[in-house]
Regions:
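Conserved hydrophobic/aromatic beta-strand scaffold that supports enzyme active sites
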Residues: 34-38, 56, 75, 83-85, ...
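Conserved short histidine dyad/triad with adjacent acidic residue
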Residues: 35-51
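Histidine-centered metal-chelating micro-motifs
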Residues: 44-46, 65, 84, 88-94
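A short, N-terminal "cap"/entry segment at the start of jelly-roll beta-barrel domains
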Residues: 1-33, 46, 119-141
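Ligand-binding loop in jelly-roll beta-barrel domains
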Residues: 79-80, 88-114
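A generic "binding-loop/recognition-motif" signal
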Residues: 19, 43, 52-53, 71, ...
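A short beta-strand-loop-beta hairpin characteristic of the jelly-roll/cupin
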Residues: 56-80, 90
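Short histidine-centered beta-strand/loop micro-motifs
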Residues: 24-26, 46-51, 68, 75-77, ...
Length: 141
């Protein structure tokens, strides 16, 4: 069983809107996964929701804004040292608004246990790519 996951030994997934650096695959845990999200200035993932996931972000560097709800309510700025919690079922996105990359460590927690339909990080990324019309092979490079 693995207990330590070095953040300098990640697998990079470059989506058209941001990059995720996989630190700990959900397959290696009972009910969680972890990755570092990186967005360049002006980038933002699309507004999205996780029905089975609570997300916790710790901002490492850069500046962003927390947007929540289907009506895109601005919850204000986030920056280094801030901890953000996104409850299950909450629509959200975090655009990078500064002039440097926004980097934050994400811990996804699955209150009901690891999702059986997407038991690995890669299976989840394939679903995300399909839902957004992105090429999985291009994302995983």
């Amino acid at each position: 069983m693995k207990y330590v996951f070095p953040t300098d030994q990640t697998t990079r997934y470059r989506f058209p809107t941001h990059a995720n650096l996989l630190v700990m695959d959900r397959a290696e845990a009972t009910a969680s996964e972890s990755f570092i999200t990186v967005m360049e200035p002006g980038e933002a993932p699309p507004l999205h929701v996780h029905h089975d996931t609570e997300q916790v972000f710790f901002v490492l560097s850069g500046q962003g804004r927390l947007i929540t709800g289907a009506d895109e309510q601005d919850q204000g700025p986030i920056g280094p040292g801030d901890l953000v919690r996104i409850p299950p079922g909450t629509w959200h996105k975090v655009p990078c608004v500064g002039d440097e990359a926004l980097r934050y460590l994400v811990v996804d927690v699955f209150p009901g246990g690891r999702p059986t339909a997407e038991p690995t990080w890669e299976s989840h990324v394939r679903v995300v790519c399909e839902g957004n019309g992105w090429d999985f092979d291009a994302v995983k490079r």
